Amino acid sequence: MEIKIRRRRGQIAETTVKKEVEEEEQPLSPAARLFHAPEFNCYIISVVGLKNKIEPDMIIEGIKQTLMRHPRFSSKLVNNCNNNRQEQKWVRTNVVVEDHVIIPKIQTQHIENANADVFLESYVSDLTTIPLDTSKPLWEVHLLDLKTSDAENVAVLRIHHSLGDGMSMMSLVLACTRKTSNPNELPSLPYQNRPSSGSSSLKTSSRCYSRFFWLVMVLWSAALLVLNTVCDALEFIATALFLKDTETPIKGDFKLSKGKRMCMVHRTVSLDDIKLIKNAMKMTVNDVVLGVSQAGLSQYLKRRYGEQEESKRNSSNIPKGIRLRAALLVNLRPTTGIQDLADMMTKGSKCRWGNWIGYIIFPFSIALCDDPLKHLRRAKSTIDRKKNSLEAVLTFVVGKILLNTLGVQRAANVLNRALSNTTMSFSNLVGPVEEISFYGHTVTYIAPSVYGHPHALTMHFQSYMNKLTISLTVDPTVISDPHKLCDDWEESLRSIKVVVQERTSTQ
């Protein structure tokens, strides 16, 4: 009897040890392995402006109480060779938070605000050339005692993309913040109504039409969805094989080398102006952002082509039939998950973490329009057509299939070729609607972006309170004047707003 009990206890102990080992070691997901391939060694970087002076001890203690509870932030990357096959795992380790918090010594007494902005841009750009140390978890926080034109001090968060996508990271960072009006409350995001093509439209149709016509409409909608998805799939395949964008002044010839220096700048505009246009044109914020971006890119290219052909300065300068497409990132999660991530760090609960993003190949219509509202209408028409497709889901699924069948290196080559044949990346994230604090430090703006992928231009938009921050990550050898692109974006927004106000007042 004793022998049986001992054996059973031994089995229980062995099972417990196995379970602990499994919890201590986690294999990298296929997407995480992809982000460690040389062609896709991507990093997420976020510049956070703070309203008050940084107190490093408060931030370090806050990180210990929050981020350290998340397994990805307390695990390091380990490469093992098993039967001549390389295996990558996340292995839990003891983290010394102070080693991840970097406080550079800056001689600020002779730096004015304008020069401080240049210093910050140079500092962040230099970070893009320095890889993270793989002997410890792949994240770091830089605390800069630097007063800029729009912040008292600045924090810079740098995280390897294999830890999760932009939505994961943004939600996680927001889960570490609190409302300034109520320090015990998590920030809230604006409600996003995502009506499915099913429920509400089907109910309305069933009231208005007979069942026969209702069935015809359902079949027609399904047929359009399938047709659009097939067309988008064929375009993606063609792009991966041979279909290239026009060689414009903003398209890099990207054989992205390791440690390539990227330049990062940002500009903040009023979100109220975006909403004014949105309400007048009966669009979404994303529609307006896409339309203004299309107008801004057209203005910027007009100048660049004019510089190349000074003799034609009085003409439109822009060649006809430009193919300029963006890889538009789409979050595939049903919810943003701030509460789930906060629970994860306090209770150990699980939520959908990792890289859950798909791509849409979005064609910008580059042209000069007498009526700036044409850019809005064209952008809305294009994105509405893309919404009636499963392209984002398809690219996510195909990416996983390629990784599982071809392996990381070959899949990286295919995806790298597809992205290299487009011109730029584009993403838009929704932020908190009220003022928040980051470990006791009031936040003035959030400017996230990503680098390491084969694009000379990445445009990222982040809303916060009543502001919208535009972050540009550019290859300075291709786009040497990113601030002028920001100027063109801002001027396009202003001109569209003026036209909208004039037409609204005359109605």
Swiss-Prot record:
Residues exposed to the Cytoplasmic side: 1-211
Compartments (UniProt record): Cell membrane; Endoplasmic reticulum membrane
Claim: Aminoacyl-tRNA synthetase is one of the keywords in the record: no
Membrane topology, as annotated: Single-pass membrane protein
One GO CC term on file: endoplasmic reticulum membrane
Glycosylation sites: N314, N421
Transmembrane domains' residue ranges: 212-232
Organism superkingdom: Eukaryota
Residue intervals on the Lumenal side: 233-507
Gene3D superfamilies to which the protein is assigned, alphabetical: Chloramphenicol acetyltransferase-like domain
Reaction equations catalysed: a long chain fatty alcohol + a fatty acyl-CoA = a wax ester + CoA; an acyl-CoA + a 1,2-diacyl-sn-glycerol = a triacyl-sn-glycerol + CoA
Pathway recorded for this protein: Glycerolipid metabolism; triacylglycerol biosynthesis; Lipid metabolism
Active site: H161 (proton acceptor)
Entry GO MF terms: diacylglycerol O-acyltransferase activity; long-chain-alcohol O-fatty-acyltransferase activity
GO biological process: triglyceride biosynthetic process
Family: In the N-terminal section; belongs to the long-chain O-acyltransferase family.
Protein name, UniProt field: Wax ester synthase/diacylglycerol acyltransferase 5
Organism, scientific name: Arabidopsis thaliana
